[in-house]
Amino acid sequence: MNSVIVEDDPTLIHRFLFHAENKPDALAYCFLEDGEIDRQRVSFRDLREMSTVVARIFSSVCQTQEPVLLALPNDCRFIVGFLATQLESLIAIPVYPPEGKHKRARFTSIVHSSGARVLLTSSEYIKRCSNYFSTLADDGVTVIDIDSLLNGLLLPLPQGVSDVNGTLVPGEVSTKATGLQGAESSVESYNVESYIEPSAKPDDISFVQYTSGSTGEPKGVVITHANLIENQRMIQRSFCHDESTVFGSWLPFYHDMGLVGNILQPLYLGIPCYFMAPIAFIQKPFRWLALISKYRVTTSGGPDFGYALCAKRVKDAQIASLDLTSWEVAFNGSEPVKLATITRFHAKFSSCGFSAKSMYPVYGMAEATLFISGGSRHNEPQALQIDSAELQRGRIIGAAENENSKSLVCCGDDIDRQQVCIVDPASRLPVADGSVGEIWVTGAHVAKSYFRNPELSRSTLAATFDSASDSNADQSQCKYLRTGDLGAVVSGDLYITGRLKDLIVMRGLNHHPHDIEATLQQLDASLGEYACACFTDNIGDVDFLTVVQEIAPTYAKSGSLEDLADKMCEELNQEHGLTLDSIYFVRPFTIPKTTSGKLQRSAMRSRLAENAVTPIWRYLSPRIAPLVTQNGTLEERVSYVR
């Protein structure tokens, strides 16, 4: 392997400048229009020139280590804006643009919690969110239009964006918001050859990753330059990347996997990445595979659902045009990795060169910058067939494949026991090999704080073992990230079993909600197209199981929801020994998710408690219906009692 790593780079921005100096004309990023047309290619020199222009403007309105909001499209402008913050040693805060009620509420929450007074956005978002941005400006936030700064440098412009004098830049908002009326002329006369030398130090904050978690309230994970560059080294080593690596991606830039894994890892290595918009992939999953085939991509991946979507929607006739022999690392993470998905994907695409050894299950999270561990890089994914009943008791016991077993995919091969530990969350002590506990992580890549939230930082990012009972004194002094994930280590390999907060405990047995949800969604092919959330609820001292299932409007009109509810109750009783007391059939996109697509079960539970959901149809068991009527909190929701 040809190494491209310089171990003494103090920060990633220094590494980027090294590439800009030594191979200025090399391709850094290519952006595809509609996931198919090669529209824009950007070299390292281009990136340096454009980011320097924006950084100069930042220097006139920002102090060192001041937070800057980045609400930009998934294209070159996002990367330029991010690099500009790094050049000026500012704190980048990527945030989804405030389009739509939910995103606007999240955006407002991040503005307030971060205390940011500067926002970098684009001309199209200034137009579409003009009233909202004007309100921010009235509150003292400086809103900067990146398109006006890069006029003449960013060519060709993304489709639908005009130049600074075009119709997509509302002058009254732009002028009022930015307070930089003289910025245009200063940029035109600015000599981009007078580059900026970054002052960032390893312990300075590089950016803040806002993650919603299970409750829906954004929390900002502080990523220092030291965290970032250590995680880049970990990714490079584990993925076996070198100077011949070529990336391809459809992941959103605001997601940690998209930013850290697909923008910054190529930048760190000095290699190219080919991007397509997330919507282009969702519309036609074939586009992703065609990109890999056309540009001879070696590393590309995403959540499990992306592979499932390809296996389901790519037509056999399309496969004949693909050549996936270049695809060495097909990373699969961000949500539970399913053996069934891996098997179906390989079966469908092996004929066009996809190797089973390329599939690479990974585990990570924003609090660890991104990457924590991965499976065996040069072997087929490893899976355990385990006894489902023993898993309910917190033990991983091998079993033959049958109706009483389930599969777990390895997401960490030969892990470092000092960095990844399985801990009993009650006693705060490590558990034995093969026992399920909470996954705790430590290392230079792990964040030390949440932005402006010291209490949460102490409880989640600085956990320690119970030193009074721990025989390993050195390890008991370490501070760990409590991931909130449940898992086990078997023969040195890591297996993820679920989320601690989502765990359903009934009659002393542990049930993982995604297992229950998977059982229910197999009852009808149409159910798998939409989200399903399972959790425990309570009225007074009575705990009960609730399922919320999104359904298509056409299904709701068929009049068969009562039969479906009966099937759900019977199936859960037969497969899991559980009584289902409450079912809500709701419209698509009702169940809230995180920005990375994970179900927010706690948030869904809260929405039901607040009567914030109008179900299409609902069922309550005879055990719960009288309590609902007496309690009064859910009385209006009852429409069917069996």
Swiss-Prot record:
EC numbers: 6.2.1.47
Q: Which reaction does it catalyse?
A: a medium-chain fatty acid + holo-[ACP] + ATP = a medium-chain fatty acyl-[ACP] + AMP + diphosphate; a medium-chain fatty acid + ATP + H(+) = a medium-chain fatty acyl-AMP + diphosphate; a medium-chain fatty acyl-AMP + holo-[ACP] = a medium-chain fatty acyl-[ACP] + AMP + H(+); decanoate + holo-[ACP] + ATP = decanoyl-[ACP] + AMP + diphosphate
Q: What is the superkingdom listed in this entry's lineage?
A: Bacteria
Q: Which PROSITE patterns match?
A: AMP_BINDING
What does the record give under GO molecular function? adenylyltransferase activity; ATP binding; ligase activity
The UniProt entry, under CDD domains, shows: FAAL (cd05931)
Q: Which GO terms describe its biological process?
A: Actinobacterium-type cell wall biogenesis; fatty acid biosynthetic process
InterPro entries cross-referenced by the UniProt entry? AMP-bd_C, AMP-bd_C_sf, AMP-binding_CS, AMP-dep_synth/lig_dom, ANL_N_sf, FAAL/FAAC
Output the PANTHER family linked to this UniProt entry.
DISCO-INTERACTING PROTEIN 2, DISCO-INTERACTING PROTEIN 2 DIP2 -RELATED
* Function description: Ligase likely involved in the biosynthesis of a polyyne metabolite. Catalyzes the activation of decanoic acid, followed by the loading of the activated decanoic acid onto the acyl carrier protein TtuC. Decanoic acid is the preferred substrate, but it can also use 10-undecenoic acid and lauric acid. Nonanoic acid and 7-octenoic acid are only weakly activated.
Q: Which family does the record assign?
A: Belongs to the ATP-dependent AMP-binding enzyme family.
Instruction: Identify this protein by name.
Output: Medium-chain-fatty-acid--[acyl-carrier-protein] ligase TtuA
**What is the scientific name of the source organism?**
Teredinibacter turnerae (strain ATCC 39867 / T7901)
